Amino acid sequence: MKLEMALSIALALAVVSWTQEFFPKEAQTLNWSKFSGFWYIIAIATDTQGFLPARDKRKLGASVVKVHKTGQLRVVIAFSRPRGCQSREVTLKKDRKRPVFRNTLKGVKGFHVLSTDYTYGLVYLRLGRGGSNYKSLLLFNRQNISSFLSLREFLDTCHILQLTKQATILPKDDSCAHTILP
């Protein structure tokens, strides 16, 4: 029993340590002007129950990211939900110490670009209010199709975040995504 507990603690510490090394500590090098614009959401992994509709009703998501003011982003996200296509807009403020944007009043605990080459983006989104916390990993792409390498990175990151079972590649139907075209 004690050995199992010790092994569990050691494994948890190793995962936390490796996760901190995997994720960039600073996004200062990210060019937000280049990252800004329209993105298709090609894939999602989330621990939010009931977020996506039934498989036959799923569609590509979309996001528009804009630099609002210095240290602020305006983000619009559209998704096919159980009640149809829905979009939300929120203004996020950059954290002073961490490379993450947030708006806790609107339930956004973190919007963090984990990696990008400006044709794709891997975005870690943390939501929550009260005692509820949810994490999502989004694969952004400028086109409605993804490269093998960005999809592989998405799936590897899902594994690290323990979201592999929830990973979903969205079908190419972009009718919901086009509702927020700038």
Curated annotation (Swiss-Prot):
Q: What is its main location?
A: secreted
> Where in this chain does the entry annotate a coiled-coil region?
none
For this UniProt entry, the molecular function terms from Gene Ontology, in alphabetical order, are:
small molecule binding
Tissue specificity: Expressed in epididymis.
UniProt modified residues of type N6-acetyllysine: K165
Q: Name one GO cellular component term.
A: extracellular region
Its BP terms in the Gene Ontology are: heart development; inflammatory response; macrophage activation; response to lipopolysaccharide; response to stress; response to type II interferon; response to X-ray
Keyword Nucleotide-binding carried by entry:
no
Asked whether the UniProt record includes Acetylation among its keywords, one would answer: yes
Which key words tag this protein in UniProt?
Answer: Acetylation, Disulfide bond, Glycoprotein, Secreted, Signal, Transport
Q: Which CDD domains match?
A: lipocalin_10-like
Q: Which residues are glycosylated?
A: N31, N144
SUPFAM superfamilies with a match to the protein in the record: Lipocalins
Q: What does this protein do?
A: May play a role in male fertility. May act as a retinoid carrier protein within the epididymis.
The similarity annotation says: Belongs to the calycin superfamily. Lipocalin family.
Could you tell me what this protein is called?
Epididymal-specific lipocalin-10
The source organism is: Mus musculus (Mouse)
Give the classification, highest ranks: Eukaryota, Metazoa, Chordata, Craniata, Vertebrata
